[in-house]
Amino acid sequence: MFTPTDISGEPSAVGTQWTPYLSHPVDFGAQHFLEAMLNVISQPNINSSVIMRADIISDSLNMMPNIMGTDKANEGFIFDTHEGPVDDDKKDTDKDKNTPVPPNLQDYEPRQVEVTPCPVKRVIVRRIIPRNPQNDFSVNQTCIVHSDKPLWDSDGKETSEGAKIAISYISHHDHPKSCPYYLPCVKAVLLYFDGSAISVYYEKYTDYELSAEQEERCGRIALHLLHTVFRHSSGQKAGYKKRVHHDMIIDRIKFQDRYIYLKQKYAHSLVSSWVESTDPRKHVFEDLAIAAFLIELWGQMYKNKDDIYFYDLGCGNGLLVNILIKEGYVGEGVDARARKSWQTYEPEVTQKLLEKIVVPTVLLDQMVGQAQYLPPHAAEKRLAEANGLATDPRVFQTAGLPENAFLIGNHSDELTCWIPLMDRPFMVIPCCSHALSGEKKRFPPTSSDPEEKSTYRSLVGHVEQLSSKIGWQVEKEYLRIPSTRNAAVIGRTRVEPQMNIFEILYSEGGGEGWVERARDLCAKSPRNH
């Protein structure tokens, strides 16, 4: 139960310059508070959805990786590219002109505050990067760990038990009007743990009086900060373990910088020109994030954009195809039903969006193989059907995909389990659960962990198993996208297969009914996901 107490009328316990705001009793220890606060220092997005991340500029104990000595130390936002062609895109986007830059951005020197019972034990300078640099600017901030006892020994091992600890935040701006909107308009913020309670204090400007609105915001932020500290410290005591781990394949900073770049370049025009009945903001920002991840993934795999030809199978509204082609990649999108959006894209994109059904080659081979066991009339009919599918211009052929093909399945439903079996590197983001026949199916859990037994987790686990059986080294990433179905299964490195494609098809119950269900999709309304 979170029931904070207003302590604004009480004397300050940490020095007369500090104004008390709120307090809350605790039953966790100093080590839990310290661990939680260090996590919040490195991830300020925990406190505000406006903030994307923090780049650590310096750490007096050198325990956090920092950006000093890199180009990132000099600017609030830098787009790093792994290849030459993107530089041409930079010329078309004058983002610096539109991005507000605070006057103290190159002020790396730590700032100081006094906390009466607690000397300084550690000083960290970070840069806060907002999600939307066009609306909010970055700011450097000193984060100081104060304590009445030593918190780390000479080997860096924590020794905080029984300590009083204060964490102060001092933003590097010299006037309250330079304070970003996502921060309280004060000189410094303090979170104080004394063993029995946690409290929030502000050091206010002596020559600037807050407006009623600013004062109200300070109160709301104090409440939010206190709640975050209480919740995360309690979680540390309870032995909280992260259930989902992000950024296992692509570095978080590289992904986020790429995402910001794409969002600044495309988001406004894509949202304003949306013609589908679905929520434009969800789809636009989700596909921009997926595009950012793919571009960084391909940067690891290929030297140049020309080295890859992508296929987005089950591409839906074609938005992801549109973004990738605009970014200089070559590829196609395939879906059983055209969408209204297709005609709103530029001609070079529209002509790459194909209204076709996907029939995996192995099903045609299976039909031909089965014909020899059928009576002559039935065999002739089966062979004619296979030949008709192989030559039908409305059927996308998976045979003969180029060697440099990369397959994408972004919530592609019926195709999700098929894509890893198509003998080309791939990334699939599972959504709805279907067997190789196209029929809806709930797969059994692949783990004894209770957290992994949902329909969705079971589907993801099944896709991983299929990928492994056919000979892919399976990688999984939980994408930073606005969707709960955000697991991406990736195959880009070949290993020894455990089964061949026909063995897998047999073990999965076969693909009987796939063609009929694929054709039926053409007559149905598209799914809104």
Swiss-Prot record:
Protein source organism: Yarrowia lipolytica (strain CLIB 122 / E 150)
Predominant location category: cytoplasm
BP terms from Gene Ontology: tRNA methylation
Skewed-composition ranges (Basic and acidic residues): 80-98
Gene name for this UniProt entry: TRM44
Annotated stretches, region: Disordered: 78-107
Reported function: Probable adenosyl-L-methionine (AdoMet)-dependent tRNA (uracil-O(2)-)-methyltransferase.
Chemical reaction(s) catalysed: uridine(44) in tRNA(Ser) + S-adenosyl-L-methionine = 2'-O-methyluridine(44) in tRNA(Ser) + S-adenosyl-L-homocysteine + H(+)
Keywords for the protein's UniProt record, in alphabetical order: Cytoplasm, Methyltransferase, S-adenosyl-L-methionine, Transferase, tRNA processing
A Pfam family assignment: AdoMet_MTase
Cellular component, GO annotation: cytoplasm
EC class: transferase
Subcellular location: Cytoplasm
Identification of the protein by name: tRNA (uracil-O(2)-)-methyltransferase
Family: Belongs to the TRM44 family.
